[in-house]
Amino acid sequence: MTKVLVVVALLVTLISYSSSEGIDDLEADELLSLMANEQTRAKACTPRYYDCSHDRHSCCRSSMFKDVCTCFYPEGGDNKEVCTCQQPKHLKYMEKATDKIKNLFG
């Protein structure tokens, strides 16, 4: 048991030391430029029921959950796969339930 405590204490010390050194090395200007670069990297999301075949992880979020890129083959015609951002039914029902609970107690 004492060995476990010693190892945990050592890990906590190492993590706190490394994080404090990393924060001290960054200046405020560098932090702001890093945040600006991160914001420019963010790409626009794909709205619900729009084509997401170009990037299947680009669907927008609803109020609680992220929509899912769902692919299917339409009936009739060609065998081309179509992908759209959709909200799964179980998540839709969960959002409706939480909204009703919020309205009940809100």
UniProtKB/Swiss-Prot annotation:
Disulfide bonds join C45-C60, C52-C69, C59-C85, C71-C83. One of its GO terms (molecular function) is toxin activity. Pfam families: Toxin_35. The keyword Secreted applies. Keywords: Disulfide bond, Knottin, Secreted, Signal, Toxin. Residues 1-20 form the signal peptide. GO terms for cellular component: extracellular region. InterPro entries: Spider_toxin_CSTX_knottin (IPR019553), Spider_toxin_CSTX_Knottin_CS (IPR011142). Its main location: secreted. The keyword Hydrolase does not apply. It is found in: Secreted. Residues 21-41 form a propeptide. Expressed by the venom gland. PROSITE patterns: SPIDER_CSTX. The presence of a 'disulfide through disulfide knot' structurally defines this protein as a knottin. Belongs to the neurotoxin 19 (CSTX) family. 02 (D7) subfamily. This is Toxin-like structure LSTX-D8. It comes from Lycosa singoriensis.
